[in-house]
Design a protein with these regions (language model features):
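Amphipathic terminal alpha-helices
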Residues: 167-187
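Catalytic helix-loop patch of NAD(P)-dependent Rossmann-fold dehydrogenases
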Residues: 1-36, 40-41, 45
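Glycine/proline-rich active-site loop of Rossmann-fold NAD(P)-dependent oxidoreductases
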Residues: 12, 35-51, 74-77, 85-86, ...
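Residue-level signal for the nucleotide or nucleotide-sugar donor/cofactor binding architecture
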Residues: 5, 44-48, 80-86, 113, ...
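Non-catalytic, hydrophobic alpha-helical segments
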Residues: 88, 92, 107, 118, ...
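Glycine-rich Rossmann NAD(P)(H)-binding loop
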Residues: 35-39, 65-80, 105-113, 137-145, ...
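Conserved C-terminal active-site "lid" loop/helix of NAD(P)H-dependent oxidoreductases
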Residues: 85, 139-163, 174
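Mid/C-terminal beta-alpha module of Rossmann-like enzyme folds, strongest
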Residues: 53, 57-59, 91-141
Length: 187
């Protein structure tokens, strides 16, 4: 694992410290992948692409995605492990209910999906024709941009988490139809 920035290094250093000191027997560390869902309106630029894409698709009937600069990945074909917030909560609560378990666990879907899939799900949830515009990726992030992330879910499954994970399409549909369109916030 090679972190891409100081924030990533700080997380890795803590993980290594916890492992070296034996603390992992008594604590749980969770590595969240690309979580999206209700109540992220306060996150500004850090909101998920589901919310950002919803606003673009609703307001201008188009959704912007970065062009690809890596062979083997089409424009919008960069992959992420997208996870609906309900599943992230279920996995987190699993460890609260099983205090005997310790270690570092991934919280993801275990499936890499691309940005085109996410954009299509947003348009489908709005009953609109898919209209993706591919834009240049800023030079400042091109060399650091991750083209593939996917959570390895074997460890959390072996620990006993057996619940099904919501599909990208079902999660986007629920979020768009039940929260974003009616502008509903969880309290």
């Amino acid at each position: 694992l090679t972190p891409l920035n100081l924030y990533g290094y700080s997380k890795q250093w803590f993980d290594l410290w916890a492992k070296e000191t034996g603390a992992l027997k008594t604590i749980v560390g969770l590595k969240y992948f690309n979580v999206f869902g209700p109540n992220e309106y306060h996150k500004g630029d850090m909101q998920s692409m589901v919310r950002k894409g919803f606003l673009q698709a609703r307001d201008v009937d188009a959704l912007n995605l970065f062009k690809s600069y890596k062979p083997g990945y089409e424009d919008g074909g960069q992959e992420r492990d997208f996870l609906y917030v309900r599943d992230a909560v279920a996995m987190t609560l699993f460890f609260l209910e099983h205090k005997e378990i310790g270690g570092i666990f991934n919280v993801g879907s275990g499936k890499a999906r691309n940005w085109n899939d996410l954009a299509s799900a947003v348009f489908q949830s709005l009953n609109k024709k898919v209209n993706i515009k591919y834009i240049d990726m800023p030079e400042s992030i091109r060399n650091q941009y991750q083209y593939h992330t996917c959570a390895e879910m074997g460890k959390i499954r072996s620990a006993g988490f057996v619940e099904a994970i919501t599909s990208l399409e079902d999660g986007v549909s629920d979020y768009v139809k039940n929260y974003l369109i009616p502008d509903k916030h969880l309290e």
